[in-house]
UniProtKB/Swiss-Prot annotation:
GO terms for molecular function: rRNA binding; structural constituent of ribosome; tRNA binding. Disulfide bonds: none annotated. The keyword ATP-binding does not apply. With S4 and S5 plays an important role in translational accuracy. The modification 3-methylthioaspartic acid is found at D102. Part of the 30S ribosomal subunit. Contacts proteins S8 and S17. May interact with IF1 in the 30S initiation complex. This is Small ribosomal subunit protein uS12. The lineage of its organism: Bacteria, Bacillati, Mycoplasmatota, Mycoplasmoidales, Metamycoplasmataceae. PANTHER family: 30S RIBOSOMAL PROTEIN S12 FAMILY MEMBER. InterPro entries: NA-bd_OB-fold, Ribosomal_uS12, Ribosomal_uS12_bac. HAMAP family: Ribosomal_uS12_B. Belongs to the universal ribosomal protein uS12 family. NCBIfam families: rpsL_bact (TIGR00981).
Length: 137
């Protein structure tokens, strides 16, 4: 335990917190060719690969994911939620934060119903996260 005098002279050092979604914090300036800190809730990117992955134990499935080259130059792995999708290579997508617990290295989600990714078809409840429009009566 430090003495009061030691604290006055040196002070306490703040803990550095690790970012959960670091790609959302950087923005790339094309004129100066430099990255700078500019946090954003979403980022746009282009799919470079669309594939499936098996989750960690004890789960079993084939989870859909996409490798995305973001507008800030970073390449990330993002999860495609919902049943069925129309993504292909070179599709433009919108990325939000949020990891997938049973897929190692997947720290982002792709937003459904925006850019080139359609919403989930025939979804009646919990439509907001899946980009599904309200059904007409």
């Amino acid at each position: 335990m430090p003495t009061t005098n030691q604290l006055v002279v040196n002070g306490r050092e703040n803990k550095v917190r690790k970012q959960n979604a670091p790609a959302l914090n950087l923005s790339f300036n094309t004129l100066t060719k430099s990255a700078r800190k500019l946090p954003a809730p979403f980022k746009r990117g282009v799919c470079t690969r669309v594939a499936t992955m098996t989750p960690k134990k004890p789960n079993s499935a084939s989870r859909k994911y996409a490798r995305v080259k973001l507008s800030n130059g970073m390449e990330i792995t993002a999860y495609i939620g919902g049943e069925g999708h129309n993504l292909q290579e070179h599709s433009v997508v919108l990325i939000r934060g949020g990891r997938v617990k049973d897929l190692p290295g997947v720290r982002y989600h792709i937003v459904r119903g925006t850019q080139d990714l359609a919403g989930v078809a025939n979804r009646k409840q919990g439509r907001s996260l899946y980009g599904a429009k309200k059904e007409k009566k």
